[in-house]
Curated annotation (Swiss-Prot):
SUPFAM superfamilies: Cytochrome P450. Heme binds at C447. Pfam families: p450 (PF00067). Cytochrome P450 monooxygenase; part of the gene cluster that mediates the biosynthesis of brefeldin A (BFA), a protein transport inhibitor that shows antiviral, antifungal, and antitumor properties. The proposed biosynthesis of BFA involves formation of an acyclic polyketide chain that is differentially tailored throughout the backbone. This is Cytochrome P450 monooxygenase orf4. Its EC number is 1.-.-.-. PROSITE patterns: CYTOCHROME_P450.
Length: 508
């Protein structure tokens, strides 16, 4: 038996050497520039995603490679990455059917949702069934519902924090329960009362943050996902305590969806699962599990991203008096009784017309990015970038963050400057500046809930900053500077978020 060990070792070395030679010289990707070690092995990415620094650092490594090798590089044995702000909208255009990677679709354990659908054709069918719920017109109809959530939040602030100068509010938590309540109601048709949780610390919203931490482990070792799914729920919850809160939320909604499937008033619609059950989708697309995954994916994806954007905006409004003062001047023209914490709020139609408020939201979107991870896809047809042709079936990707820090488009790009969005500005190439705001991505897989997210941001900022004053507490720029990729952007480990105290009613 032992005499086979040298033979096995030689066989293994021969295979490894042959694989390296193929990847360096014979692979369809061999012609693309980039570091040779990354072309040979995917362990470079694994090391930087899991072990280097605080993890999630590969995005910064291949940024350095781009500076050395150019705008198109090979970042691992099977993937080409492009860094060119002008090409983002072209690559992810609505006219180009692109496929998600099957192993990445399994990372969040929701393969039946539109978010994780691999096939562009199936994705189109699934998206069409619910897209009418997220049109601008439909969101406008729900303006009062969004305002009601913000009014409930304002009441909580007045009851529990107003007059208690030393009580600290984590704005990240506050905005998370606001967005989660709204999105869950939109998805499931139920008010969950996240806003009513003590200190705005809801188990569900906390779970969303913590469950993204092992994202790269699942991406680098997809087989782990299958193993974990096979484990009993009790074991999973022991290994990851936040899974218990998430599973409790899932179980409650599965029962609710099952009831909705047979409800007499299902035709009234208004939720994602009623839209699915009432659609012309084939029967296999109307299963309770698929409807549940669709709604849950939307709720999970929308809650944290909107809250992060609102937290970035809140920091800068509290950090820079000039920005706050200019917003106050604009709001004074539309808020009827701006001296009262009970001031009635303008309609969404009016808020959408405010240029400086729009500039604040656009800057917050630009500096919160939406997704911090690269967006890998494949195509059945060749992709042409300058003189480079990416063959069919080869993985290619781009990121949002580099475009948002392209100094040709956004000078002084790390500074928060709402005024850069005023007076219909143009980029260096003559295109509207908004064409380079990619927080909601682009193409057929762009964010389904964009209009709802924007409505939440407009109403949230106006309601809070018309009604309240606060002071930053033990918070600085490092708490909104994102230095880790966890699919969503993350600040340094140890950051406690954007925190404030000394809450008072607004005085003009």
């Amino acid at each position: 038996m032992y005499h086979l060990i040298p033979f096995a070792a030689i066989l293994g070395m021969t295979y490894a050497l042959s694989l390296a030679i193929y990847r360096l010289f014979l692979s369809p990707l061999a012609k693309f520039p980039g570091p040779k070690l990354a072309a040979v092995t995917g362990w470079v990415e694994t090391y930087y995603q899991l072990f280097y620094g605080e993890g999630g650092q590969f995005i910064f490594l291949y940024k350095e490679w781009h500076q050395k090798y150019g705008p198109i590089i090979r970042i691992n044995p099977w993937e080409v990455h492009i860094s060119d702000s002008c090409f983002f909208e072209i690559l992810y255009s609505t006219n180009r059917p692109l496929k998600k990677l099957p192993h990445l679709a399994k990372v969040f354990d929701n393969e039946l949702s539109g978010f994780s659908t691999v096939s562009p054709e199936l994705h189109r069918i699934r998206r069409k069934a619910v897209s009418h719920l997220f049109s601008k017109g439909e969101v406008l109809k729900r303006g009062a519902q969004i305002q009601s959530a913000m009014d409930r939040l304002s009441e909580r602030l007045k009851l529990d924090f107003l007059g208690h100068g030393n009580r600290v509010i984590c704005m990240n938590d506050m905005w998370s329960v606001y967005t989660a309540d709204l999105i869950a109601e939109y998805a499931f048709g139920r008010h969950y009362g996240f806003i009513d949780q003590p200190n705005f610390e809801a188990d569900f919203t906390k779970a969303l943050v913590h469950l993204l931490e092992p994202t790269h482990l699942a991406q680098q070792f997809p087989w782990l996902t299958d193993i974990l799914k096979a484990l009993p729920t009790s074991v999973l919850e022991f290994l990851h305590p936040h899974m218990a809160a998430f599973n409790k939320f899932k179980a409650a909604n599965q029962v609710r969806i099952a009831k909705a499937n047979f409800a007499k008033d299902l035709s009234k619609g208004g939720t994602m699962f009623s839209a699915i059950f009432n659609s012309d989708l084939p029967d296999e697309e109307k299963s309770i599990e698929r409807a549940h995954q669709e709604a849950l994916a939307f709720a999970a994806a929308g809650a944290e991203t909107v809250a992060a954007t609102l937290s970035v905006a809140s920091f800068h409004l509290l950090h820079d008096p000039k920005i706050r003062r200019r917003l106050d001047e604009e709001l004074a023209t539309v808020v009827p009784d701006s001296r009262s914490s009970d001031a009635s709020m303008p309609s969404l139609e009016i808020l959408w017309q405010l240029p400086y408020l729009t500039g604040i939201i656009n800057e917050a979107l630009r500096l919160s990015y939406g997704s911090y991870a690269r967006i890998p896809r494949t195509s059945d047809t060749p992709i042409q970038y300058d003189e480079w042709t990416i063959p069919p079936g080869v993985v290619f990707s781009m990121d949002i963050a580099p475009a948002h820090h392209d100094e040709r488009i956004f000078p002084d790009s790390y500074s928060f400057k709402p005024e850069r969005w005023l007076d219909n500005p143009q980029a260096f190439d003559g295109k509207p500046l908004t064409r380079y705001l990619f927080s909601f991505s682009r193409g057929t897989r762009s964010c389904l809930g964009m209009q709802l997210a924007l409505a939440e941001m407009y109403i949230g900022i106006v309601s809070f900053f018309s009604r309240f004053d606060a002071h930053l507490f033990e918070t600085d720029l490092t708490d909104i500077t994102f230095v880790r990729d966890r699919f969503a952007p993350r600040p340094r480990i140890g950051s406690r978020g954007v925190r404030v105290n000394r809450l008072t009613t607004r005085k003009f």
